[in-house]
């Protein structure tokens, strides 16, 4: 399952060169990921209510064309790898005016990997055991060929 999340670039997200500051792409990814979980029917708040959190293990972003203040972009994401202890998302940032995202060249691409830990002691847990319904939803949404 892919999700397209629209983002309007705000002035405060840009740097002295007038383009989106590089670290803000990671915030866009996080915003899209939060909406993805909600779309799966499992918002972050549900994890937190169970005493679980999902920290970033690894994140990367490759930048292409600059995005500027006032631009409308779309962050497209998909789950691309899943293990009982780890989930991987891939992201593409497109021009928000683009109609056919399958043919469009992304402004940026990225990837993040996340685990699941207990909030109280930061010990890792198996998603498959601790939150099997989330694991199954990720599994059903998995797109390993999404690059």
Regions found by a protein language model. Give the residues of each.
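Hot-dog-fold acyl-thioester-processing enzymes
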Residues: 1-58, 117-147
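HotDog/MaoC-like acyl-thioester-processing domains
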Residues: 3-5, 68-72, 80-147
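Short, well-ordered turn and helix-capping elements at secondary-structure junctions
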Residues: 11-13, 60-65, 97
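Hydrophobic beta-strand-centered segment that forms part of the acyl-chain substrate-binding groove
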Residues: 36-87, 105-107
């Amino acid at each position: 399952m892919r999700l397209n999340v629209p983002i309007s670039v705000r002035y405060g997200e840009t740097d002295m060169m007038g383009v989106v500051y590089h670290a803000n792409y990671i915030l866009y990814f996080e915003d899209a990921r939060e909406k993805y979980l909600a779309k799966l029917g499992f918002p972050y708040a549900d994890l937190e209510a169970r005493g679980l959190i999902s920290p970033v293990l690894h994140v990367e972003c490759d930048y292409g064309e600059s995005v500027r203040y006032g631009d409308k972009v779309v962050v497209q994401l998909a789950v691309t790898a899943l293990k009982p202890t780890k989930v991987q998302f891939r992201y593409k940032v497109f021009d928000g005016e683009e109609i056919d995202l399958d043919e469009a060249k992304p402004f940026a691409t990225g990837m993040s990997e996340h685990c699941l830990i207990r909030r109280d002691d930061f010990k890792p847990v198996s998603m498959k055991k601790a939150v099997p319904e989330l694991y199954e939803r990720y599994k059903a949404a998995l797109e390993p060929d999404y690059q």
